Every structure is written in structure tokens, then in C-alpha cells.
Amino acid sequence: MSQESPAGDEGQDYPVQPFPTQTLYALLAAETAGLRGDVPFALRNYVEQARITGDPGVIARAVQIAQHAGDEAALGELGLLWVDREPDNVQGRELALFTLLRQGKPRDALVHAHFLLENGDGQPLRQLAAQAAGLPADRHAALLTDYQALAASHPDDVDLLFGQALLLWQAGQLQEALALSAQLIELQPDEPANQLLHTQLLDETGSKEKALAQLEQAVREHPENPGLSRAFVRMLFSRRDTAFAIEKLEQLSRINRGDNSLRFGLALAYRDASLPEQARAELELLARDPELRNDAHFHLGQLAEAAGDTKRAIQHYRHAQGAALLPATARLANLLAQQGELTAARLYLQELRVQHREQAPGLFQIESELLIRERYYSSAQELLTESLGAFPGDINLLYARSLASEKMGDIDAVERDLRAILDQDGDNAAALNALGYSLANHSTRYEEAQSLIERALALQPNDASIIDSLGWVLYRRGLHTEALAQLRRAAALLTDPEVAAHLGEVLWTTGDSEQARAVWREALQQYPDDPLIKATLERLNAGPL
């Protein structure tokens, strides 16, 4: 361990200090354990002695071991301790900064970023701003004010300008952000990160043609930068002009022959243009690229599935790993189930959970969705209870179990799981909406249900499923006019059989039977086997449409 520690040869040399016998024994035991490969024991001893002695040399060695072990919690504690003992230590400042960022304390982190800026490293100012996007509005505004105050004494520092522009963008102050990005271009015209930021802001502020032209030029000038290529592909696709995207990507792919990000974009453009053979040819080449092969196999699987070649689709989905593992596995499991091989699908998912423990919660969720789709509700509930034994408190698994319980009519279990989610995350819009909808559907606690749904809607004001829930609870309360307004809005945002079932029912109840039939008829054309619409028709005795 001591020879291989990544920081072992770069740290500051500290003079040997006399230690009490107990400390010396603990440190010697730690070094011996490290040589035997018992890194956890070595780290525990060094962290404990770093706390006890506060000695910078002990802290530095503890940091080396924590880095070797990849123990972020220990690194965070040691970084803060190091800064307390040696305020001018750059490595300690870096560790403290990223610890505070992980803890969601960006203004405290900015103190250390300022120190690093004064010592020649402004990069953390960019990273800090990039991680501020999810902050509450008041804390985000305070951080932006801090950046602006710092900029007064560093008016042309590119890292500070970049971070400030990001914060302004996040705050919706697009013109101010654009002005700073233009200043960055003047100071560093050939820096890819500046070009990317500036063109994205041009696009956001409506100068879409100018943004696309400048980003295309940047891609030509920096063929080695995949980030620019990926951004160019996204910007092209946002235009929703597939023919134009193909033309541009074919041109650039001929110039930047080694840029596989462009080729991947071209493959997707071919797919969207209903040119599967061209898409397949590109993707088969990209399947040889270590960075893109997983995504390539996933999309090859989709092409094969669309062509009805189930065997080939399954082969490709099996090869999709990394970030593509879960979506590919979900498709593969569905294909097996459609062939009547549900048991084989479940065995495959069980094997993957052993091989990819870090992905096990998602794999449990895929299996539960499969069981619910096949109407094995009790099995799904049992599986999710098992999964929560291995991953207690997992929000996605709790939510999935609530769905299974709802299918079984176990509303008490639904409420328990959704409230367990809200105990962890009171602003979880999905849980708020699901609980409100469940109460509206299966109880008379309508006011409580509406309050929960309105909280969800405040968090996601344009979510059609939440708007549908609000319409439904208003209907259950007898507020038919208000319910119709919300359900019509939901239907305009989302084509969905549940929304159609609800809208049709309210129309039917208010006497507009012809409009209700038209809504149901249109929905059944797209979803001919939807059980909710059929159950609604039967319950209302709506007769043949």
C-alpha cells in the first residue's frame, strides 16, 4: 500500500515529530497492516491519530491512505481538519472545498475556492458553479452575490467569469450570462469550454442560427473535443429537422473522421429518418469503440426489435453494459416475457443482480414492473419487500412497492410506503401526487388528497399526470366545472388512456355523453386493450361506442 499510494511521492515532507508511545504504536500498527494489504485497519488507525494529534504529517499520510482506499467520507473529514491545522495547505483546501460541495454548502466552499484562486487555481470556481444548479433560490442568489463581489477584485479572471455566467444562466438571467460569455470569448477565443458556453447561451436567447454556425465552426477547429461534438448533435436534434441534421453530420463526419460522437449522432438521425440500414451500419462500427459500444448495442437492439428480429435484439441487449445496462435489460426482459419466457427473464435478472450489485435496486425494479405488467401483483410485492431488506429505505423501491400494493387494493400499504418516501424527501413530487391520487380514489379524505396534489403541482407545474390527479380529486369533490378545466389541460399536454378515462367520465357525468364517447373512442384507437377505459365504460353503463 505505502509504495502505491497515489499521493505518496507528491505530498509535502514534514519533520519527524516525537509522539506518545500509544500514538507511535498505533501508527506502526497501521503501516504494518498496510504492508499486509489491510487498508481499512490502516486507515482507521491513521484517521483516529489524525484526530487525536492534529499533526499535519499524520493528516497527510492519512489522506494518502484514504485516497488509496477511495474513502470519500474520510477524505472529507481529513480535509477540514488539515485546513484547520494548516490554512495555507493547497491540498487541504481542495479536499475541504469538495467536501463542502458534497454537503451542499457552496458558500462555505467558496471560501476555499477563493484561496485557491489567489494561489493560481481558479478551476474550482467553475466546478462550484456547475454544482449549484439544484440549490434553493435564496441560497443560489446568495452564492451569485458572492461571485459578483469576488469579480469586483478579479474583473478579467476567466474561471470566475465562467462560474458567474453559469450561475446567471441557472438563475434565468440569460442576457447577463450571454454578456459574460462574450467577454470570455474575447479573453480566450479558442478555448472550447468558452465556445460551448457562449453558443449554448446564444441558442437559449433565440439566436439559434448563429449558435449553430458558431458551434459547427468550433467542432471543425477542435476535432479532438467530443464535448463540442455532442453539444452540436444535441443542438441539431433540437431543431427537429432530421434531413438538415443528416446533411450537417455527414459533412462533418467526412472532415472529422475520427470523431465518433458525430457518427453516433448521424446513426440516430438515420434512425429518426426511418433509414434503419444506414443507422445499423454506423452503429455496428461504433460497437467497436470502447466508449460508445454500450449505447451502440442498445440502439442496435432497438433496431432489431423494430424489425421483428427478437433473437438479434436480445443478443445486442445482452452486450449493453454501463449506463445502458438497465434500459437494455428492461427491453430484454420484456421480449422474453412476450415470448412466454417469464421465468427465464426473472432468472436472468437474478443473475445480473449478483454480477452488478451496484445496479441491483434498478434490476429489482425492472423485475417488479415485469411482474405487475403480467399481473402477478403478489409476487411483485414480495420481491420488492425482499429488495428493501437488502436496500432499506430505497425511494425507488418503496415507490415500486406502493404500485404493487395499489394493484392488490392494499391501500394502507400504499400509504405507508409513500409516507416513508416523504419522510426522506418531503418535496418528492411523484410520491406527493401518488399519495394524493390514492387517497382521492380509495378514501373520502379529499381535502388532504387535494393538498398533497397541489404541493406536487407547485413543484412540477406542467406535469400532465399531476394535473390529471388534480382534476380527478376535484371531480370526486363534486367540483365538475373546475375538474373539467384541469382534465382538458392534462389531455392537451399528454395522450394517455388514464387521462382519457377520467376526462370522459366527467364529461359523461355532466351530461355531455357525445363528447365523452368521442374522447373514449379516440383513446381506444391508440390503446384498444386499456383496462381502465373498459372498466369505466362498464361501470358507467356507457354501452358500445
Place the predicted regions along the sequence by residue.
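Alpha-solenoid helical repeat scaffolds
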Residues: 14-35, 44-545
